[in-house]
Structure formats: C-alpha cells, structure tokens
C-alpha cells in the first residue's frame, strides 16, 4: 500500500491560520481530480501545476506562494514525479500486468473495495466501437472501461499512477503484435 511521502521544509513557513508548517505531505491525485483541474486551467500551465500541487499537498494558494523557491521546487518535483509515475514504478515487489494491484485501492460503485483488477486485451469489435466515439477522451474512457470492467466513475477514482499504468498497457494492446505479449524465457 502506498504511504504518503513527506518533504521537510528547509525554510518553514506559516499556514493561512498562522500555524507553523515544517513538513508537507504528498498524496497522489486521482485521474478525476487531474481531469477537472486540467479543464479549469486549460490555457495556463503554471496555474494547473499550482492547482495540482495544492490538491496533492493540501496547501492553499497563499501557503504555496509563501514557500521559498528551493522548497517549492522540491515539492513541485515530487508532485510531478507522482503524477507521471506508473503504479509498477511505485509498488514494491513483482507487478502482475494481467491482474494489476492498485497502488491506492478504490471503492467500487457497489461499495466494495477494489485492490486489483483484471486487464484483458480488446477485441477488434471493441476497437471498432471505440473509434465511433466523438473525441479522444470518450475513446479513452470507452477502451479503459471495456478492458477493465471499471465504470467511468471508478476510473476517475484511480490514482494517476494507476491510471498511467493502465494507459501504458492499453497502448501496448492497441499497437503491439501478439509476439510482444509472449512470456520472456
């Protein structure tokens, strides 16, 4: 299970309430959080990054602006690393790509906790159906749901690392020949 990471500030600051902040904890964003923030800050990468840092750390915009630049750079780098990592990069031990373990378990639509899922390659009929969707996002959600059995709302609850892992494998399914998937001996 993923444990939140911590950065000890070299230059402690104060919270909006005047309390000292000496440590900042990082939590992975969910795919849904990131999608919402991306839509809100479409044309401003700096604001998007700061919104992602705020969502990951719980720091307000004012608290982020009170950080000294070296501490901010450390936090920014760690948040970006979490946002871009795949679950297999963060999970210790062997990773099963056919039945991946979730870095951060989610609650299913039925209320059960999901700690892993079964990933199956799409059929040609499924990829034909995927191509009928109007835009890239709809195609991505359709193929992700078809290959995992997750609903759109369950997909939105996946951590970005779990989402990145899923997308990496789906790209393999859509682009690689069968020989790519044979076990290596």
Language-model features, listed with the residues they occupy:
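A detector of tandemly repeated sequence units and domain arrays
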Residues: 51-52
């Amino acid at each position: 299970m993923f444990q939140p990471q911590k950065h000890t500030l070299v230059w402690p600051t104060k919270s909006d309430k005047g309390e000292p902040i000496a440590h900042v904890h990082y939590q992975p964003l969910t795919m849904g959080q990131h999608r919402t923030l991306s839509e809100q800050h479409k044309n401003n990468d700096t604001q998007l990054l700061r919104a992602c840092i705020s969502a990951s750390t719980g720091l307000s915009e004012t608290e982020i602006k009170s950080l000294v630049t070296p501490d901010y750079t450390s936090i920014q780098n760690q948040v970006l690393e979490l946002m871009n990592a795949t679950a297999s990069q963060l999970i210790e031990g062997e990773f099963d790509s056919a039945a991946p373990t979730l870095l951060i378990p989610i609650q299913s639509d039925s209320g059960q906790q999901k700690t892993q899922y079964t990933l199956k390659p799409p059929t040609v009929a499924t990829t034909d159906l995927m191509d009928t969707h109007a835009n890239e996002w709809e195609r991505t959600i359709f193929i992700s749901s078809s290959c995992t059995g997750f609903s759109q709302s369950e997909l939105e609850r996946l951590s970005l690392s779990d989402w990145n892992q899923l997308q990496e494998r789906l790209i393999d399914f859509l682009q690689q020949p069968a020989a790519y998937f044979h076990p290596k001996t």
